[in-house]
Design a protein with these regions (language model features):
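Short, low-complexity intrinsically disordered segments enriched in A/P/G/S/L with frequent Arg
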Residues: 2, 11-13, 19
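Conserved beta-strand hairpin/beta-sheet module of binuclear metal-dependent hydrolase folds
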Residues: 25-73, 165-177
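Metallo-beta-lactamase
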Residues: 120-123, 143, 150-235
């Protein structure tokens, strides 16, 4: 496993990129972890298959690390997938799009956040994050055939109105964004949050197998079985 690399220059972006490979049947999950309070310790995931096709989920601020990794490993970026439209999960969209011209996908009810700095909460961070890349919207149950294994879209309105999870059934992997976090859940007091829809959204996740591996938008990975035991919200 390659050593974690940390910038030693105050002029460069402060980032720690974890090249920890998780082999799960037909796919490999590579977490890119951006450790900076300004970006709320957001996680980015690169998922690739045996044919060197890959997708990036929630590109945070580790722009060059993602680009370098994809180029160094001769990967073909098929798509940029967004679990929701908050600024800390979409900052890297334009950089990746300009580098690879990959399709961008987001939940239908979160599409407005890509072009609205209030809705995507970047104004709260004293910034104005806007995505210029073209994008397509996703609906519940939609299947994406981007990798060797299909990716299913599960809508989970709660943290935002258009939050979605990405589920790879054969590998039993779920990318939850800020819906489920390690031993907790995302906030429900931000613009477009739908707290009243939490239980209906959670019921979709609870229907998945207990051994489902969970990769959230912040924090460490977990499993649905563990979250059922220790997370008071996963009931």
């Amino acid at each position: 496993m390659p050593t974690l690399q940390k910038s030693d220059s105050p002029q460069r972006e402060k980032e720690i990129i974890g090249y920890a490979y998780f082999f799960v049947l037909m796919i490999k999950v590579v977490p890119f972890i951006y450790e900076d309070l300004d970006d709320l310790y957001a996680n980015t995931y690169l998922v690739c298959d045996k044919n060197s096709n890959c997708v990036v989920i929630d590109p945070a601020k580790n722009y060059q690390g993602l680009v370098n990794y994809i180029n160094k490993n001769s990967l073909c970026l098929k798509a940029i997938l967004l679990t929701h439209g908050h600024a800390d999960h979409i900052r890297g969209v334009d950089v990746l799009y300009n580098a690879f011209h990959a399709s961008v996908y987001i939940g239908f009810d979160d599409a407005d956040k890509l072009n609205d700095s209030y809705a995507n909460c970047s104004e709260m961070l004293g910034e104005r994050v806007l995505v210029k890349a073209p994008f397509e919207t996703l609906s519940d149950g939609e299947i994406l055939s981007l990798l060797e294994e299909e990716i299913k879209v599960i809508t989970v309105p709660f943290h935002t109105s258009g939050s979605i999870c990405f589920y790879l059934k054969e590998s039993s992997v779920l990318f939850t964004g800020d819906f489920i976090l390690p031993h907790g859940i995302g906030r429900s007091d931000l613009p477009s949050a739908k707290p009243h829809m939490f239980h209906s959204s959670m019921s979709k996740i609870l229907a998945l197998p207990n051994d489902t591996k969970i990769y959230g938008g912040h924090g460490k990975s977990s499993t649905l079985e563990l979250e059922r035991r220790v997370n008071p919200f996963v009931k």
